[in-house]
Amino acid sequence: MDNERERQAAAAARVSGEAATARASAGLEPLVLASASPRRAEILRNVGWPFETQAADVDEQLRDGEDPTAYVERLAREKAEAVAARRLFGLVLGADTTVVVEGRVLGKPADDSEARAMLRLLGGRTHEVLTGVALVRAESKRVR
């Protein structure tokens, strides 16, 4: 499974890099996806938006007292800001998604065992999927 993810991520980076080059040569501002997620890249490809990807390295720990909505909004903003800080120009798109069940935020499972435990927790229960999105202009570092 990891090899398939790596293959998809490499293909997405290759395609997005080519699209970004074409966009830049046309004089258009580049869109940068602040994520290594093949799913997010797939969404942008499916809508036909040219982009490039740069992974953001941010602390994804839930802070004490932080509610789930504030959590995904903060992570989206921090990811976009981290990538924008390394760029001179362009629009940087950050996003984060989490699942909340019975008030508990479920992070990324560390391994297969934790993933199975999460699925058991979700079984037969209503849950929410929350996504935060932030757009940062690299030149001004202004967040939208």
Residue ranges and their predicted role:
Residues 48-65, 142-144:
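Short glycine-rich, Thr/Ser-proximal phosphate-binding strand/loop in the N-terminal lobe
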Residues 28-54:
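N-terminal G-site helix/loop of the GST-like fold
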Residues 37, 57, 97-99:
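Short glycine-rich, polar/acidic loop-and-turn segments at beta strand-coil junctions
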Residues 2-7, 13-17, 22, 26-32, ...:
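Anionic-ligand binding patches
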